[in-house]
Amino acid sequence: MENITNNSERSLDRPKRQRPVSMENVGGTASGSEVARSATLLELDLLDCPICYHKLGAPIYQCDNGHIACSSCCKKVKYKCPYCSLRIGFFRSRILEKIVEAVVVSCPNAKYGCTEKIPYDNESESAHERVCEFTLCYCPEPECKYTGVYTDLYRHYHAEHKTDHSWFKCGEYNNAWLHVTGEKLSFLVLQEYEDGPLVVVQCSMESHGICVTVNCIAPCAPGVGEFSCHLIYRNGSEKITFESKKMNKIQKVSPENHVANYKPIPYYLRGEASNFMSIPYYLLDEASILKMQICIRRSGEEV
């Protein structure tokens, strides 16, 4: 009884997740279909496993007293219902499986403008969120806490943070100068004229040299922030070039989306698999400024 009380108390303490929910037509028994067609649920917690609190999904099991559990929890409790001690994990709750399968919820980004409806399961929701056009993006300025959909972020950056040295024009070479400061991550934000897309050039000092990456701040939605870039570094007669036919997209500037997750490759061995430019230390001058040139083009406009 102690376990039941604790579970109940924890369930009451949890904040209720309320999102617009509808039930779509699904096949099956008449009773299951009728429930699916007519019901509207607001408390999404009702569709969570009462033991682990994760979203329910087939197979869903119930004991003879009607208590339910997901398949993984049945194994964890050794097929003994924690509420009544009867066997659980042998009889499936088919109607509840039909209901869960039929539930369609609004995207978590609905309040920002997304109108997509997605099945109520972790896999579908995660898959949509990865490519949702309304995923929030963060202002790259270190002291700024602004977040918003990418179009609003671009307007915000133009209004609040624009400088004379941070513009770029597609198809033309622009200066990309970065201060190299020890192991600290340095970055430069470039914005297409007016309130256009934001491109971030990042560099850091690694064991093999300076690593430079170029990313566009944009959601991973198809057709948004689709750019290519060409980067050039010169030191006397020496020249290193880097070309990315498909610029990576990020939502937030951080070390995690820089070279920490990339496998270092010497510049002379760099191939199509590399997504950063490596500049050996012996090619650096004594100045603390890394002077490069960058040409950014929209996908499909490459020459």
Curated annotation (Swiss-Prot):
A molecular-function term among this protein's GO annotations: transferase activity
Catalysed reaction, written as an equation: S-ubiquitinyl-[E2 ubiquitin-conjugating enzyme]-L-cysteine + [acceptor protein]-L-lysine = [E2 ubiquitin-conjugating enzyme]-L-cysteine + N(6)-ubiquitinyl-[acceptor protein]-L-lysine
Binding site for Zn(2+) 1: C107, C114, H128, C132
Keywords: Metal-binding, Transferase, Ubl conjugation pathway, Zinc, Zinc-finger
Region (SBD): 99-286
Cited SUPFAM superfamilies: RING/U-box, TRAF domain-like
Pathway assigned in UniProt: Protein modification; protein ubiquitination
EC top class named in words: transferase
Stretch list, region Disordered: 1-30
Keyword Membrane annotated: no
Annotated zinc fingers (RING-type), start-end: 49-85
Zn finger residue spans: SIAH-type: 102-162
Keyword check for Ribonucleoprotein: no
Enzyme Commission numbers on file: 2.3.2.27
Amino-acid positions noted as binding Zn(2+) 2 in the UniProt annotation, renumbered to this chain: C139, C144, H156, H161
Similarity comment: family membership: Belongs to the SINA (Seven in absentia) family.
Comment on protein domains: The RING-type zinc finger domain is essential for ubiquitin ligase activity.
Free-text function comment from the UniProt entry: E3 ubiquitin-protein ligase that mediates ubiquitination and subsequent proteasomal degradation of target proteins. E3 ubiquitin ligases accept ubiquitin from an E2 ubiquitin-conjugating enzyme in the form of a thioester and then directly transfers the ubiquitin to targeted substrates. It probably triggers the ubiquitin-mediated degradation of different substrates.
Protein's name in the database: E3 ubiquitin-protein ligase SINA-like 3
Annotated organism of origin: Arabidopsis thaliana (Mouse-ear cress)
